[in-house]
């Protein structure tokens, strides 16, 4: 293949000059002398010069260094050999367990499946988390976004979903850590190891200490591995933490490439980059990819271009609220803001739909009454409104739930609640079956039986 030499280095962006008759194509991978650093061609500037992004540190590089054109895009290992392993953006093992020993490598830039090949599914994916199963049910083979500001529990919710779904789900999982904390990646690895499901998970990390090129491409590396499993006819779970960091890496790269920024300083190609990634995360007639993505919301502003661009690609959106977290209700999922395309009586059935809408109606009415309560107090409300407030406060508390992954912090064992039990419990609260129970009994419990036990214990305590 042709070779060129470095003519300019600006941070993570490197210009390489090639003979004019053998200029590399856009997205071709270039190998630098010494073989440690890979570059990816982003632009052809003319006169045989290409502008590239470094997939790794640019420390110690200098002008004149030779670069070899591989003639093809970055390719990564795919197939069952990747399971139980931690890899970087180039598919190199970083877990000190020796070579991957892959039989096949796929390019990370691929076309999305054609419209005729795609397949939709109406099957529900039970998560064991009450508020999600009731208000924003997940579809098997669908895309889910966990939206939240800093510190409201995106990663903990993601870990609980992995714990509940990946362990119950007999299929394979791919976890892409995009620009998140290395500590969380480490915790995830040992969590999977302890649960004996490590041999079903492939992990790809490009964490926040890495250059923007790595963070921009690591999501594609993870997705390529998931696509291979899907095309073999398997059902795959793809976890991405965090999609916002993918956008942010794109912003950094875009600025380094000299593009004019658009709204709020984001790259002008924001919608296109997001589309290229999201359109590939889809289920086909051969197999399915169910994707769960954490989305950081800058300054808790859901209208920010990055989360706003992500919204349109998702089947279900789980919105985490700082107000709910400040009340000590975890998971801090907002039942009035979270939505799902599956919340349709034709998909989930009349009973589930009516209970979910009933819960939302009661909570919405309580939200409207809060101003009156703040000014005039509870006594000024009608009897009907007092009943609504009482039930809403019980529902609010009953939407909380102890998590398995938080056991080490809270000391209380995690609870998995089946969908059937969730629907029956909330239907009982709406029908007034538990009006005589104190609202404290509903806080941090699994099923309704546990709340009844708590209420009994409280009564006995008062009796003494």
Swiss-Prot record:
Main location: membrane
Catalyzed reactions per annotation: ATP + H2O + 4 H(+)(in) = ADP + phosphate + 5 H(+)(out)
The enzyme's E.C. designation: 7.1.2.2
Family annotation (SUPFAM superfamilies): C-terminal domain of alpha and beta subunits of F1 ATP synthase, N-terminal domain of alpha and beta subunits of F1 ATP synthase, P-loop containing nucleoside triphosphate hydrolases
CDD domains documented for this protein: ATP-synt_F1_beta_C (cd18110), ATP-synt_F1_beta_N (cd18115), F1-ATPase_beta_CD (cd01133)
PROSITE patterns referenced in this protein's UniProt entry, alphabetically: ATPASE_ALPHA_BETA
Residues annotated for ATP binding in this entry: 148-155
Alphabetized Pfam families for the sequence: ATP-synt_ab (PF00006), ATP-synt_ab_N (PF02874), ATP-synt_VA_C (PF22919)
UniProt subcellular location: Cell inner membrane
Sorted UniProt keywords: ATP synthesis, ATP-binding, Cell inner membrane, Cell membrane, CF(1), Hydrogen ion transport, Ion transport, Membrane, Nucleotide-binding, Translocase, Transport
Keyword check for Ion transport: yes
Annotated membrane topology: Peripheral membrane protein
GO molecular function, one term: ATP hydrolysis activity
GO (cellular component) term, any one: proton-transporting ATP synthase complex
InterPro entries: AAA+_ATPase, ATP-synt_VA_C, ATP_synth_F1_bsu, ATPase_a/bsu_AS, ATPase_alpha/beta_chains, ATPase_F1/V1/A1_a/bsu_N, ATPase_F1/V1/A1_a/bsu_N_sf, ATPase_F1/V1/A1_a/bsu_nucl-bd
Similarity comment text for this entry: Belongs to the ATPase alpha/beta chains family.
Reported function: Produces ATP from ADP in the presence of a proton gradient across the membrane. The catalytic sites are hosted primarily by the beta subunits.
Quaternary data: F-type ATPases have 2 components, CF(1) - the catalytic core - and CF(0) - the membrane proton channel. CF(1) has five subunits: alpha(3), beta(3), gamma(1), delta(1), epsilon(1). CF(0) has three main subunits: a(1), b(2) and c(9-12). The alpha and beta chains form an alternating ring which encloses part of the gamma chain. CF(1) is attached to CF(0) by a central stalk formed by the gamma and epsilon chains, while a peripheral stalk is formed by the delta and b chains.
Protein's UniProt name: ATP synthase subunit beta
Gene name per UniProt: atpD
């Amino acid at each position: 293949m042709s070779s060129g030499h470095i003519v300019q280095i600006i941070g993570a962006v490197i210009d390489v000059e090639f003979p004019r008759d053998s200029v590399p194509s856009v997205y071709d991978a270039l190998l630098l002398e010494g073989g440690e650093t890979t570059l990816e061609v982003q632009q052809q500037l003319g006169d045989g010069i290409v502008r590239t992004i470094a997939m790794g540190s640019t420390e110690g590089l200098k002008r004149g260094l030779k670069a070899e054109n591989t003639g093809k895009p970055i390719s990564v290992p795919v197939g069952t050999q990747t399971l139980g392993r931690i890899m970087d953006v180039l598919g190199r093992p970083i877990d000190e367990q020796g070579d991957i020993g892959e039989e096949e490598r796929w390019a990370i830039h691929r076309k999305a499946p054609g419209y005729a090949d795609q397949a939709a599914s109406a099957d529900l994916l039970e998560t064991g988390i009450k508020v999600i199963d009731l208000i924003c049910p997940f579809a098997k083979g669908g895309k889910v976004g966990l939206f939240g500001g800093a510190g409201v529990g995106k990663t903990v919710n993601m870990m609980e979903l992995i714990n509940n779904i990946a362990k119950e789900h007999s299929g394979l999982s791919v976890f892409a850590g995009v620009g998140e904390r290395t500590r969380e990646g480490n915790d995830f690895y040992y969590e999977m190891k302890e649960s004996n499901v490590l041999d079903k998970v492939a992990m790809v990390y490009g964490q926040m200490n890495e250059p923007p090129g790595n963070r921009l491409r690591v999501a594609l590396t993870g997705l390529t591995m998931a696509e291979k499993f899907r095309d073999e006819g398997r059902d795959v779970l793809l976890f991405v933490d965090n999609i916002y960091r993918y956008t942010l890496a794109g912003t950094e790269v875009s600025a380094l490439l000299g593009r004019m920024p658009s709204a709020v300083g984001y790259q002008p190609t924001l919608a296109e980059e997001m589309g290229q990634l999201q359109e590939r995360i889809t289920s086909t007639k051969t197999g399915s990819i169910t994707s769960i993505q954490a989305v950081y919301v800058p300054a808790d502003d859901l209208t920010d271009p990055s989360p706003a661009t992500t919204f349109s690609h998702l089947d279900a959106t789980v919105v985490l609220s700082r107000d709910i977290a400040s009340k000590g209700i975890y998971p801090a999922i907002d039942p009035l803001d979270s939505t799902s395309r599956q919340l349709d009586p034709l998909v989930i059935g009349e009973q589930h739909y009516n209970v979910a809408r009933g819960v939302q109606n009661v909570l919405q009415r309580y939200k409207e009454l809060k101003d009156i309560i703040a000014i005039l107090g509870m006594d000024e409300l009608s009897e009907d409104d007092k009943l609504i407030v009482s039930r809403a406060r019980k529902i609010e508390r009953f939407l909380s739930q102890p998590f398995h992954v938080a056991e080490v912090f809270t000391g209380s064992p995690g609870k998995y609640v089946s969908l059937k039990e969730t629907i029956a419990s909330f239907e009982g609260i709406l029908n007034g079956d538990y009006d005589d129970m104190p609202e404290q009994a509903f806080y941090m419990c699994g099923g309704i039986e546990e709340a009844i036990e708590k209420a009994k214990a409280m009564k006995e305590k008062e009796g003494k």
